[in-house]
């Protein structure tokens, strides 16, 4: 696990140099939750309803805003209001993957205006280092607001069967994160990555690990998704667990998110010795 993963969120929040990461750990500590809900719904009403009902129990709400069939500016302003009301961060799972000039326009501009409302974004590094550099540069634009409350996760590994995000790809993900650590918060991965390229690691390094595919009941789906439990994910180094269908498709999503919160927090306390 990361050199800091044995420490409580409160300590990591206090010592972390990245303002957004510090805020994220503070939210987790205050709300006693490490749950990220992946709200993969297709209407604004469903998204806002989930955000309002589940908001008190989560640290982060993950969106795929481009699958909404009725997206309007009102949807985004309402989502921001709910994030403030319930104290959670918004993670737009856009998975940027293009040349630098294009991703800059996709992030800061275009129809979705992602930089204006999403605290966290992510990217794949198949295009090379330039995609990370370009996204980091965008936050330095004169018209970019709230730059210290924006951050990037690099998609270093995936939980789908047969994923090619392994080996050299994962190593380069860690290398680029270290180079652009002012904007890169950490990784979406199946484990902590602190032992990748250990010769480059600084003692103060503290990247956040988000792990997808967390589900209390299913082993996987027909499309190659492979699940792990909150306990196994946190045990492998996840700081924040991402759960989707196991929560929003449950008969009672509020009851479900509380179970994930309880299991995730129990695993976290075991890891840090509380």
UniProtKB/Swiss-Prot annotation:
Q: In which pathway does it act?
A: Pyrimidine metabolism; UMP biosynthesis via de novo pathway; UMP from orotate: step 2/2
Q: Which GO terms describe its biological process?
A: 'de novo' pyrimidine nucleobase biosynthetic process; 'de novo' UMP biosynthetic process; sporocarp development involved in sexual reproduction
SS bond partners: none
Catalytic activity entry: orotidine 5'-phosphate + H(+) = UMP + CO2
Keyword annotations = Decarboxylase, Lyase, Pyrimidine biosynthesis
Q: Which Gene3D superfamilies match?
A: Aldolase class I (3.20.20.70)
Entry similarity comment: Belongs to the OMP decarboxylase family.
**Protein name per UniProt:** Orotidine 5'-phosphate decarboxylase
* Organism phylogeny: Eukaryota, Fungi, Dikarya, Ascomycota, Pezizomycotina
The UniProt gene name for this protein comes to pyrG
